Amino acid sequence: LMMLSMVFVMITMSAESARRIAEVLEQKSDLVSPENGVKEVKDGSVRFDNVSFKYSKKAEKYALADIDLDIKSGETVGILGGTGSSKTSLIQLIPRLYDATEGTVYVGGRDVREYDLETLRSEVAVVLQKNVLFSGTIKENLRWGDPNATDEELERACRLAQADDFVRAFPDGYDTYIEQGGTNVSGGQKQRLCIARALLRKPKVLILDDSTSAVDTKTDALIRKAFADEIPDTTKIIIAQRVASVEHADKILVMDGGKILAAGTHEELMANSEIYR
């Protein structure tokens, strides 16, 4: 009898869990492609026109407020700010992971809501601080960026991301097996492989969300130089903790409390912004 009662309780709990999972799976996203969505992104320009955003309609506080921003195609833009300053919230609106609550976000001169979602997201690559490597060879992991990439394209992407040297140092090179989650490579190596994977997509906008945090300053500088020399037409948006990672950017934004408090070049901000200094 005790066994039967335990089985009954487990069945009841399982049924409730299954019901909740079904609710999640059946939930429809508000983010859908429009009918006849635009299938080409002209360039990597990005513009925020009086954008405010909150994660829930019921939320009282805005995560972003009154954001006006104009990034020309091919520019490098750095974003600095403390934890909770909504740097990541800002960049998530570009590939339309969320929609702005108020105002409009433009990519390539068009409202992001006009694009076919797959098209937009194929042209806006985001590399997170904690990205994911899958179990499989380095080649297989990189080809998540472009399944049809040639070996030469893989190697070029890794050279730009400063990953080629350490990959070639492995006995099996690009055929080295990566454990689930990338546990057999260092944090900095993992970040560089994830950057290389994003580069294989040849995006018009490349966003690095603190994704060189585990990389030493010398390698970080080499990555920035490679970007400037080899992909000048790609718009680069770099969220960083180190000023050195963005001091050579065309524009640097200083954020706090969901607002842009200061913007300009490193020299302009050093001269005019107390919070930056």
Go through the PLM ranges and name each one:
Residues P34-K39:
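Short, solvent-exposed loop/turn elements at beta->coil junctions and helix N-caps
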Residues V7, Q27-K28, N272:
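Generic structural signal for alpha-helix termini and adjacent loop/cap motifs
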Residues E40-R277:
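ABC-type nucleotide-binding domain
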Residues E23, D30, R143:
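Conserved E/DxxT/N motif and adjacent residues on the DHp alpha2 helix
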Residues S5-M6, S33, T88, V105:
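Residue-level detector of alpha-helix boundaries and kinks
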Residues I11, K28-L31:
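Signal-transduction coiled-coil helices of two-component systems
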Residues L1-V24:
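Cytosolic ends of transmembrane helices, especially the final helix of ABC transmembrane type-1 domains
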Residues L31-V32, R168:
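Transmitter module of two-component histidine kinases
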